[in-house]
Swiss-Prot record:
Superkingdom of source: Bacteria
Membrane topology note: Single-pass membrane protein
This protein's GO CC annotations: cytochrome b6f complex; plasma membrane-derived thylakoid membrane
Cysteine pairings via disulfide bonds: none
UniProt keyword annotation of Coiled coil present: no
Localization per record: Cellular thylakoid membrane
The name this protein goes by in its record: Cytochrome b6-f complex subunit 8
Primary role: Component of the cytochrome b6-f complex, which mediates electron transfer between photosystem II (PSII) and photosystem I (PSI), cyclic electron flow around PSI, and state transitions.
Keywords associated with the record: Electron transport, Membrane, Photosynthesis, Thylakoid, Transmembrane, Transmembrane helix, Transport
Keyword Metal-binding belongs to the record: no
Quaternary assembly: The 4 large subunits of the cytochrome b6-f complex are cytochrome b6, subunit IV (17 kDa polypeptide, PetD), cytochrome f and the Rieske protein, while the 4 small subunits are PetG, PetL, PetM and PetN. The complex functions as a dimer.
Species this protein is from: Mastigocladus laminosus (Fischerella sp.)
Record-annotated membrane-spanning stretches: 3-23
GO biological process: cytochrome complex assembly; photosynthesis
Amino acid sequence: MEIDVLGWVALLVVFTWSIAMVVWGRNGL
């Protein structure tokens, strides 16, 4: 279970970072 939680956390971080980069790029920051 600990590996499952770690995997979900890593996935969430990568997903959030990807969305942030797309939004920032669209805003021309």
